[in-house]
Amino acid sequence: MSKDEEKEMSNDRYVSPLSERYASREMQYIFSPDKKFRTWRRLWIALAETEKELGLNITDEQIEEMKSHADDINFEVAKEREKVVRHDVMSHVYAYGVQCPKAKGIIHLGATSCYVGDNTDIIIMAEALKLVRTKLVNVIAELAKFAEEQKNQPTLAFTHFQPAQPTTVGKRATLWMQEFEMDLEDLEYVLGSLKLLGSKGTTGTQASFLELFDGDQETIDKIDPMIAEKMGFKACYPVSGQTYSRKVDTRVLNVLAGIAASAHKFSNDIRLLQHLKEIEEPFEKTQIGSSAMAYKRNPMRSERIASLSRYVMIDALNPAITSATQWFERTLDDSANKRLSVPEGFLAIDGILDLCLNVVDGLVVYPKVIEKRLMSELPFMATENIMMDAVKAGGDRQELHERIRELSMEAGRNVKEKGLDNNLLELIAADPAFNLTLEDLQKTMKPEKYVGRASEQVDAYLKNVIRPLLEKNKEILGVKAEINV
């Protein structure tokens, strides 16, 4: 087929946006047919080696023949065979046997389809989780850098998206960071607990191996541990039906959903801050925000994070429902759903983390805008301190509290109804009950006096939690994201 024909075919078929627009080539390869079927062959080799080492009549020559064709998969032979037998595993057993005539008779010996299918799924999920882990650690590293840089920048905090006691930009970043750190804990736990299915037969009883090994229970007990070791795992699940428990997929996708929730919260905050013109995500010189409104600088990357995150959070329902509805030792209604939900969950979270890396690395902070908004609200925040100063000057606390309430309401009406600046300080200075000058009041208008321990909390969190985490993972730091659109 010519390149023009290939291009034409690609334009008249549906192509998943996850592959075309969002996920990295690295993650796409993990879920590619090439990766899948190479892993099948590695598993068949591991099984043959195990069976030989445990006494079955399998030769070194047969195993070497299998190894020599582990990576050159004859896809077309398998595809044509599947048209005849309607079974993907047996099609690839046949194709492998075509390349390995001496080993043909011992390929897949004693195994079921789930031996290659399910073990491969776990191997691929483990590899995909490692890639997610790498990117997640780098997102945390970028947020740590941002928090350190901005730890002393006072900013108006919001509760209910209404002005609240000030914090710092860096302290706010630690809130995003802590959620990603929690996700990393969950990921490492689930990744560390993954085991292989092993080779347990059609209903998990290893009946076929009783026949192969003449009922030798001690020998059969060695099969799964040996396969696990050859494939780089510590163990196999001790019991199973035909498949590994679909609860495993639920745990894995719940980790992805947790990351998606953290990313969504982060992206929402950036979108709101960009509306306030306090912080912006990166915006290229040639980037277009709107086809009609040329002045627009839309937070489209943060919006895309939110969009993909919703997909991942909903996608996590799929394995949960699949796990809940499996009958007895296995039903096949897991298969089609699993082929979609697991890869697409990983491809989407990969795109999300690339976007997070890109956004955090290029965040633009506008201190003057932040200061202007903070100073417009600070007189309200400072009223308690003002009242204390007035009491020291001889005032009555209860009377002063009522006067501040009344003057605050008046200043609020001036802002909301008349569009004026906040003149609360002027109103207080003009009220003889306070016995304070405007100069006295303006001395209290120092934002750093109202941020509490925000800066110190950033220092402590970075020192005690984040820097040890990054030191532990220093070999995977330095990843930069590339986004396609």
Question: Model regions: which residues?
Answer:
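A conserved active-site cap/scaffold subdomain adjacent to cofactor or substrate pockets
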Residues: 243-278, 287-348
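Alpha-helical transition-metal enzyme core signature, strongest for iron centers
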Residues: 86-89, 136, 140-143, 147, ...
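Active/binding-pocket-proximal capping segment
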Residues: 280, 403-410
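A helix-coil-helix interface module used to build multimeric assemblies
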Residues: 2-207, 213-228, 289-290, 300-304, ...
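A short, charged helix-loop
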Residues: 225-242
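Glycine-rich cofactor-pocket loops
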Residues: 148-170, 280-296, 329-336, 361-381
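Long, amphipathic alpha-helical stalk/connector segments used for oligomerization, subunit docking
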Residues: 311-397, 403
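Short beta-alpha connecting loops at secondary-structure transitions
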Residues: 28-32, 77-79, 287-307, 329-344, ...
